[in-house]
Amino acid sequence: MAYTYLITGATSDVGRTLIERLLHNAPADTLVLAQGCGDLAKMAELCRRYPGQLRTYDVDLSDRAKVDAFVEVLAADAPAPTHFIHLPALPVVNTKFKAFDQRRFDLDLEIEVHSAVRIRKAVLPA
């Protein structure tokens, strides 16, 4: 059985390490659909090492319309994912609770939770 992994936040250190481990010695029909946001250059070495097994997508998960467009592209151009790994997050900013940033919190919630729900609804079987 061919595995297709959909990995959001794939350009993170964790995402790239996971992709390396998944594709190292994997069957040739293994495919990773890797989402990043403005930083796909980080995937260049993996794309070179695993030609045909890694497709990259530059998608801003904080924008619901872009998330919806992304799942439409996946539905049209990629096999249905057998696995979904959701890793995106804003960079950590340590701050005192007194300096809590509601706007940043809402943005992170959109990226980490709302996008996951929208993508899962689109790619997981009913």
Locate each region found by the language model.
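Conserved glycine-rich Rossmann-like NAD(P)H-binding loop of the short-chain dehydrogenase/reductase
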Residues: 23-43
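N-terminal Rossmann NAD(P)H-binding glycine-rich loop of SDR-like oxidoreductase domains
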Residues: 11, 15-20
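Conserved mid-core segment of classical short-chain dehydrogenase/reductases
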Residues: 89-106
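Conserved Rossmann-fold cofactor-binding substructure of NAD(P)-dependent oxidoreductases
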Residues: 62-77
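Rossmann-fold cofactor-recognition segment
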Residues: 47-65
